[in-house]
Curated annotation (Swiss-Prot):
One of its GO terms (molecular function) is endopeptidase activity. Its EC number is 3.4.22.1. GO terms for biological process: proteolysis involved in protein catabolic process. This is Cathepsin B. Residues 18-79, 333-335 form a propeptide. It comes from Bos taurus (Bovine). The keyword Signal applies. It is an enzyme of class 3 (hydrolase).
Length: 335
């Protein structure tokens, strides 16, 4: 009996020690600790020579903000496959495969929205309309309803803005694609790269209601509108059904410092301090080595994670990933 109690006491001490261990964010020690746990994912370095203030600024989703009306449940009427990847389901929609870069700005709330909106315009126009919806237009012109620009915002406000005011086209930084391409440059995560260094500084650009020189139609004529915006219940099957029927959605979750080190596998939080809320685009699901996951596109460039994508534990609202799902439907009659 005493031997059993001693063993249990040791286990409790070890468990407590594991949860209370501190490793500096982005450190070799945290990478090694995660990998020694033999969990469902592998850690490695994605950021080099960056300020922690920059990394925290990337996490610009304000969690628990205003809620959109919840759409009616319909998952019971849908036969859902074990795995689903929107990139394969709609191969003629190139934006689904695209990974963007939010730069030194807490604009993830805008990126998750415009990425999923771009995908849905293509999907619901049966591939006739391929447009990169402008993150710049969303970030700079939405105003207080969306939060505070580069200092963080609400995914729900972003989708509501799309239905009320519409969004113009706009590609990546320096792409000269669309009416209002992104104006904040990608920054350098690596040691010997050519991009400017990543800092935590960065003001929200001004709202400009004109397209870049040489682009037509006009700003007003280039607007793409949503006909509805809504939240999806914190329910695994309802989220799956929404993606399966209508396309990628925007979600948000709590980021811990171990997530910054994600390289492959199915992420689940192991150790590290909280960094903030982060908005992303969920485009599918599956099962890897017995672990169910969501397939997610990030906005930290293709040199982060698994070519810019990651997988995260599905079905347990892990880090709140299932509690902030928002989406909407484009006005396809305008096409």
């Amino acid at each position: 009996m005493w031997r059993l109690l001693a063993t249990l006491s040791c286990l409790l001490v070890l468990t407590s020690a594991r949860s209370s261990l501190y490793f500096p964010p982005l450190s070799d020690e945290l990478v090694n600790f995660v990998n020694k746990q033999n969990t469902t994912w592998k850690a490695g370095h994605n950021f080099y020579n960056v300020d922690l203030s920059y990394v925290k600024k990337l996490c610009g989703a304000i969690l628990g903000g205003p809620k959109l009306p919840q759409r009616d449940a319909f998952a019971a009427d849908v036969v859902l496959p074990e795995s689903f990847d929107a990139r394969e389901q709609w191969p003629n929609c190139p934006t689904i495969k695209e990974i963007r870069d939010q730069g030194s700005c807490g604009s993830c709330w805008a990126f998750g929205a415009v990425e999923a909106i771009s995908d849905r315009i293509c999907i619901h126009s049966n591939g006739r309309v391929n447009v990169e919806v402008s993150a710049e237009d969303m970030l700079t012109c939405c105003g207080g309803e969306c939060g505070d620009g580069c200092n963080g915002g609400f995914p729900s406000g972003a989708w509501n803005f799309w239905t009320k005011k519409g969004l113009v086209s706009g590609g990546l930084y320096n792409s000269h694609v669309g009416c209002r391409p992104y104006s904040i440059p990608p920054c350098e995560h690596h040691v010997n790269g050519s991009r400017p260094p990543c800092t935590g500084e960065g003001d929200t650009p001004k709202c400009s209601k004109t397209c870049e020189p040489g682009y037509s139609p006009s700003y007003k004529e280039d607007k793409h509108f949503g006909c509805s915006s809504y939240s999806v219940a914190n329910n695994e099957k309802e989220i799956m059904a929404e993606i399966y029927k209508n396309g990628p959605v925007e979600g948000a979750f709590s980021v811990y410092s171990d997530f910054l080190l994600y390289k492959s596998g199915v992420y689940q939080h192991v150790s590290g301090e909280i960094m903030g809320g982060h908005a992303i685009r969920i485009l599918g699901w599956g099962v890897e080595n017995g672990t169910p996951y969501w397939l997610v596109g990030n906005s930290w460039n293709t040199d982060w994670g698994d070519n810019g994508f990651f997988k995260i534990l599905r079905g347990q609202d892990h880090c709140g990933i299932e509690s902030e799902i928002v989406a909407g439907m484009p006005c396809t009659h305008q096409y």
